């Protein structure tokens, strides 16, 4: 039995998931997911969001249950810290600084950079090294630069089995690479997004911190549930474990407790300012899309 995280329509409303962009900025391909317009702001139909979010979480659960790798991608300022925190919390991988062209389609070259990053880490951590302070500072500078770009995937060990993306417009190169390699893509789609190439679309606000936090957290929780199910099948008692990181080594899962971080900013940004007075009951009726 699949035990997916529970959420309600109120959770979506309180997270500001229903707020789209100004009507003038919309992508017509998102019309099926739009409920209407309020104060020149497109409002997302949360009935669609509920159904599609459940579909996406079920697909994600199935991938992780088979010990597949999940890559979180979100490089915009308001998503960066959340993407890293939630990927780490569930033991998965992330890109939160800048997507380097070829990260998927040219994995062999990226693997060489990962190898170089690990070499720098060993050099710096080796207390018996014979390098001067100046040389060590140079190594640290190079290590830090690589870590910003590929630190979140340095232990991935191969291509991911599924992508979870915040802001498909900004991360369009990553999506194209995934499509080329037939890697499924789960993505939050705002009203200005292009749903083309997205296997599991989730209509929702991809700009506000609270909305991003909601989606990243529920994705992370789903991954943790799948890992718990996998561990339970192996006879491991996982009762009471809520947050733990998971590392994959030779198809075995090793778990360790990890402190949950609570340093996220809860302020909304961009497309939430003009529709704060909308009531929950206004969002769950039939579709009234704009043509």
Swiss-Prot record:
In its keyword annotation, does this UniProt entry include Repeat? no
Point to the regions of Low complexity compositional bias.
263-277
What's an example Gene Ontology biological process for this entry? translation
Q: Where is this region: Disordered?
A: 254-291
Gene3D superfamilies listed in its UniProt record: Glucose-6-phosphate isomerase like protein, domain 1 (3.40.50.10490), Helix hairpin bin (1.10.287.610)
Against InterPro entries, the record matches this protein to: Ribosomal_uS2 (IPR001865), Ribosomal_uS2_bac/mit/plastid (IPR005706), Ribosomal_uS2_CS (IPR018130), Ribosomal_uS2_flav_dom_sf (IPR023591)
Q: Return one GO MF term.
A: structural constituent of ribosome
**PROSITE patterns (UniProt xref):** RIBOSOMAL_S2_1, RIBOSOMAL_S2_2
Q: Which UniProt keywords apply?
A: Ribonucleoprotein, Ribosomal protein
One of the record's GO cellular component terms: cytosolic small ribosomal subunit
User: Which HAMAP family does the record cross-reference, listed alphabetically?
Assistant: Ribosomal_uS2_B
Q: Which family does it belong to?
A: Belongs to the universal ribosomal protein uS2 family.
Q: What is this protein called?
A: Small ribosomal subunit protein uS2
């Amino acid at each position: 039995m699949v035990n997916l995280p529970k959420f309600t329509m109120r959770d979506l409303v309180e997270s500001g998931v229903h707020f789209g962009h100004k009507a003038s900025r919309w992508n017509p391909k998102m019309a099926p997911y739009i409920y209407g317009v309020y104060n020149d702001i497109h409002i997302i139909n949360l009935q669609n969001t509920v159904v599609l979010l459940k579909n996406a979480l079920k697909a994600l659960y199935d991938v992780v249950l088979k010990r597949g790798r999940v890559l979180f991608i979100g490089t915009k300022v308001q998503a960066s810290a959340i993407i890293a925190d939630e990927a780490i919390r569930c033991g998965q991988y992330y890109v939160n600084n800048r997507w380097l062209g070829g990260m998927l389609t040219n994995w062999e070259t990226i693997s060489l950079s990962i190898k170089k990053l690990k070499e720098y880490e060993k050099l710096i951590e080796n207390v018996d090294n014979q390098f001067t302070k100046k040389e060590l500072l140079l190594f640290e500078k190079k290590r830090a630069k690589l870590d910003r770009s590929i630190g979140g995937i340095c232990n991935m060990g191969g291509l991911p089995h599924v992508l979870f993306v915040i802001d498909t417009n900004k991360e369009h190169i990553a999506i194209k690479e995934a499509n080329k390699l037939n890697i499924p893509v789960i993505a939050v789609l705002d009203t200005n997004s292009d749903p083309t190439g997205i296997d599991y679309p989730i209509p929702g606000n991809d700009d506000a911190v609270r909305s991003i936090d909601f989606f990243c957290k529920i994705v992370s929780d789903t991954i943790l549930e799948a890992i718990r199910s996998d561990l339970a099948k192996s006879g491991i008692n996982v009762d009471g474990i809520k947050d733990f990181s998971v590392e994959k080594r030779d198809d075995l899962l090793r778990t360790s407790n990890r402190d949950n971080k609570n340093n996220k900013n809860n302020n909304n940004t961009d497309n939430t300012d003009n529709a704060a007075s909308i009531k929950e009951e206004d969002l769950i009726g039939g579709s009234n899309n704009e043509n």
